[in-house]
Structures are given as structure tokens and as C-alpha cells.
């Protein structure tokens, strides 16, 4: 049976979208051309808004209009554009630093899932905050873009660093 990927929406979340740190950057950037071809306009990469993300070009394309409005209404700090790599995939850079009360977020993970992370350092807390904010953005996108009406939605969270988004 042949599956029509053009009806599926894929959100791919990585700390290394427009942010070269290690090996996942190579994985995500090297498959973006093929993913963009398979999923078309339904392929979105989400990365951290670090203020000076390399290879990111902020755009004012019509495809961002509705999502820009709903993320603003929900006080989700996002920048929308393209990653300047082959395929020029759509990218949402997600602000997270001022989004959460660190203690409350970590308590909710402990309370809901038994994840004991109150003593976690910033190298743990920062990715949890980022990926949780990405979960909120994906939820907003699904509601705004009427994605569920067109086909299935997939969210791929790379590495442990993005696990908080799975739990959102």
C-alpha cells in the first residue's frame, strides 16, 4: 500500500534547527530537502530563538499570517521564516526564556509524570522550557492551520533535549 505523505503534516523539533552545536544539526539539515519534497507545505522545523540564529531568514510570507496571529494572542514569542539550506524549509524559532516559571514547570513534570528534575541545572532546564514551548506552538498550529482536517499530524522531537514537548 502506498501512503500519500502530502496529506501528512510533520513538525520536527530540535535544539539544532538553525543552531549548529553537534551531530543532530547534520541529521536535520541533511534530510530537510527530502522532507520538504515529501511533505510539501506541511513540513515545519522548530528551533530555539537565540536571537542570532545562523542561516535563518525571517520572512513575511502569507503562510505565516494566521499562525503569527494566534501565537501572538497566546503570548508565544516566535519568529517565522526559512532555513537557508537546500530545500529552504519553513522554520519557527520559538522563544522560551520568559515563558515559564522554572519551579512551576519542573513541579508540574514531577506531579504529572514523576520526573524528579527540581535539582536539574540550566543545561537541563533550558531544553525543557524550549521543548515545552514548542508543544504549545504545535498545538496552536494544529488549531490555526486546520491541520487535523487535512490529514494526520506527526511531531518528531529530537533527542532527550526535546522530551518536554512530548509531555506537553
Cite the ranges covered by each PLM segment.
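N-proximal low-complexity "stem/linker" segments adjacent to membrane-targeting elements
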Residues: 2-4
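A conserved catalytic-core segment of Leloir-type glycosyltransferases
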Residues: 6, 45-150
Amino acid at each position: 500500500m502506498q501512503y500519500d505523505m502530502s496529506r501528512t503534516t510533520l513538525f520536527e523539533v530540535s535544539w539544532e534547527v538553525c543552531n549548529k552545536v553537534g551531530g543532530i544539526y547534520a541529521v536535520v539539515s541533511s534530510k530537510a530537502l527530502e522532507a520538504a519534497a515529501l511533505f510539501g507545505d506541511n513540513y515545519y522545523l522548530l528551533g530555539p530563538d537565540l536571537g542570532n540564529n545562523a542561516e535563518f531568514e525571517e520572512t513575511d510570507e502569507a503562510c505565516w499570517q494566521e499562525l503569527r496571529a494566534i501565537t501572538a494572542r497566546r503570548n508565544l514569542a516566535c519568529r517565522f521564516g526559512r532555513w537557508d539550506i537546500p530545500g529552504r524549509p519553513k522554520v519557527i524559532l520559538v522563544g522560551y526564556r520568559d515563558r515559564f516559571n522554572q519551579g512551576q514547570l519542573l513541579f508540574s513534570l514531577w506531579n504529572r509524570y514523576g520526573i524528579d528534575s527540581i535539582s536539574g541545572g540550566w543545561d537541563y532546564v533550558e531544553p525543557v522550557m524550549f521543548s515545552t514551548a514548542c508543544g504549545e506552538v504545535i498545538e496552536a498550529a494544529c488549531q490555526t492551520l486546520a491541520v487535523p482536517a487535512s490529514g494526520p499530524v506527526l511531531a518528531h522531537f529530537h533527542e532527550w533535549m526535546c522530551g518536554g514537548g512530548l509531555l506537553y
